[in-house]
Curated annotation (Swiss-Prot):
Keywords assigned by UniProt, alphabetized: Ribonucleoprotein, Ribosomal protein, RNA-binding, rRNA-binding
Role description: This is one of the proteins that binds to the 5S RNA in the ribosome where it forms part of the central protuberance.
UniProt subunit comment: Part of the 50S ribosomal subunit; part of the 5S rRNA/L5/L18/L25 subcomplex. Contacts the 5S rRNA. Binds to the 5S rRNA independently of L5 and L18.
GO BP terms, alphabetized: translation
Organism of origin: Escherichia coli O157:H7
Family listed: Belongs to the bacterial ribosomal protein bL25 family.
Pfam families: Ribosomal_L25p
Protein name in UniProt: Large ribosomal subunit protein bL25
PANTHER family for this protein: RIBOSOMAL PROTEIN L25/GLN-TRNA SYNTHETASE, ANTI-CODON-BINDING DOMAIN-CONTAINING PROTEIN, RIBOSOMAL PROTEIN L25_GLN-TRNA SYNTHETASE, ANTI-CODON-BINDING DOMAIN-CONTAINING PROTEIN
Superkingdom of the source species: Bacteria
NCBIfam families hit by this protein: PRK05943.1
Database matches in InterPro entries: Rbsml_bL25/Gln-tRNA_synth_N, Ribosomal_bL25/Gln-tRNA_synth, Ribosomal_bL25_short, Ribosomal_L25_dom, Ribosomal_uL5_bac-type
Any Gene Ontology CC annotation: cytosolic large ribosomal subunit
UniProt KW RNA-binding keyword: yes
């Protein structure tokens, strides 16, 4: 099982997402269940290494946000058209 550390996003929108990507991070969202959707930011290099394994897409992952563990599955992964970069990931609560 994989564990990913995340932070709650302070800003949202196109400009904020671009600033995140310039800082070697990228936006993601956790939704599903009875809780409200949670916008988070992830470290690009750490997630890039983890997502290279097939288990990332099939197993339940643990995302730690502010010390709270959330069990999720990867729902959708958006990649840059020609660079080896992640743009955004949707996670659904497991």
């Amino acid at each position: 099982m994989f564990t990913i550390n995340a932070e709650v996003r302070k800003e949202q929108g196109k400009g904020a997402s671009r600033r995140l990507r310039a800082a070697n991070k990228f936006p993601a969202i956790i939704y599903g269940g009875k809780e409200a959707p949670l916008a988070i930011e992830l470290d690009h290099d750490k997630v890039m290494n983890i997502q290279a394994k097939a288990e990332f897409y099939s197993e339940v992952l643990t995302i730690v946000v502010d010390g709270k563990e959330i069990k999720v599955k990867a729902q959708d992964v958006q990649r840059h058209p020609y660079k080896p970069k992640l743009q955004h990931i949707d996670f659904v609560r497991a």
